[in-house]
Amino acid sequence: MSKSRLTVFSFVRRFLLRLMVVLAVFWGGGIALFSVAPVPFSAVMVERQVSAWLHGNFRYVAHSDWVSMDQISPWMGLAVIAAEDQKFPEHWGFDVASIEQALAHNERNENRIRGASTISQQTAKNLFLWDGRSWVRKGLEAGLTLGIETVWSKKRILTVYLNIAEFGDGVFGVEAAAQRYFHKPASKLTRSEAALLAAVLPNPLRFKVSAPSGYVRSRQAWILRQMYQLGGEPFMQQHQLD
C-alpha cells in the first residue's frame, strides 16, 4: 500500500473514531438529561420538519406539547403497551421471543416485513436516530436502548415514548394528538380513544385517526380486548407505570 493511501486511511480512521466519541458523548448526555428534563423535540421531528422545508412546505410544523405521566390518561399507556409491547414491564429493552418470531416470519415473507421493536427501542430510535433501515442504525439503536433501560425507569421510558410518538402528519405526542383529534387534553382520553390512537402507531402517516379505515377499526377492537386481558387500569398501578 502506498504512503498516500496509508495517510488517507489513517485520516479516515481518526475521523471516524472522533465522530464516534462525539456521538457517544452527545447521546450519553441526552440520555442523562432527558432522564429528568422534558424532551423539547426528537430526531424524527427534526427530520420531518427539515424534509417539509426542503420540499417547499413551509406551513408544516412538527408540533408536540410535553405532559407528565399524571397528565396522561392511564388508558393511553395501557393501550400502547397492549398494542406494541405487552412484555414492556418485564424485559430489559428487547423481546427476544418476538425478535425470533419476526425473523422467522420475514424469511418466509420477504415482501411483508414484520418488526419486533419494543417500546424502549422505539423510544431510542425516535428520540436519537434517523429514519430508515440498516445494520449500522440497528446497532446504534441497540446501544441507545441499553442506555435508556439502564438510566431511566420504565415509567420514564413510557412517558417519553408517549410524548414523542408520531400520531399523524405533524402531530407528535399524545397531548397534541388528543387536542387535534378529540379536542380534549390527554388526561381525559377514554379507553376507546386511547385504543384508536394506539391503532395507528405502526404507520401514522398511512393510517388516520381522523378517518380510520376498516383495518384501523379492527386493530382498535383487538387492542381493547388486549387491554382487558392485561387487567385494565390495575395493570398500570401494579407495574408502577401510572
Curated annotation (Swiss-Prot):
Disulfide bond sites: none
Topology of the protein relative to the lipid bilayer: Single-pass membrane protein
Stretches that traverse the bilayer: 19-39
Principal cellular location given in the protein's record: membrane
InterPro entries: Glyco_trans_51 (IPR001264), Lysozyme-like_dom_sf (IPR023346), PBP_transglycosylase (IPR036950), Pep_trsgly (IPR011812)
GO CC, alphabetical: peptidoglycan-based cell wall; plasma membrane
Any single GO BP term: peptidoglycan biosynthetic process
Catalytic activity: [GlcNAc-(1->4)-Mur2Ac(oyl-L-Ala-gamma-D-Glu-L-Lys-D-Ala-D-Ala)](n)-di-trans,octa-cis-undecaprenyl diphosphate + beta-D-GlcNAc-(1->4)-Mur2Ac(oyl-L-Ala-gamma-D-Glu-L-Lys-D-Ala-D-Ala)-di-trans,octa-cis-undecaprenyl diphosphate = [GlcNAc-(1->4)-Mur2Ac(oyl-L-Ala-gamma-D-Glu-L-Lys-D-Ala-D-Ala)](n+1)-di-trans,octa-cis-undecaprenyl diphosphate + di-trans,octa-cis-undecaprenyl diphosphate + H(+)
Sample GO molecular function, one term: peptidoglycan glycosyltransferase activity
Superkingdom of the organism of origin: Bacteria
Pathway: Cell wall biogenesis; peptidoglycan biosynthesis
Keywords assigned: Cell inner membrane, Cell membrane, Cell shape, Cell wall biogenesis/degradation, Glycosyltransferase, Membrane, Peptidoglycan synthesis, Transferase, Transmembrane, Transmembrane helix
Pfam families xrefs: Transgly (PF00912)
Family membership: Belongs to the glycosyltransferase 51 family.
Primary role: Peptidoglycan polymerase that catalyzes glycan chain elongation from lipid-linked precursors.
Protein name in UniProt: Biosynthetic peptidoglycan transglycosylase
Taxonomic source organism: Escherichia coli (strain SMS-3-5 / SECEC)
Gene (UniProt): mtgA
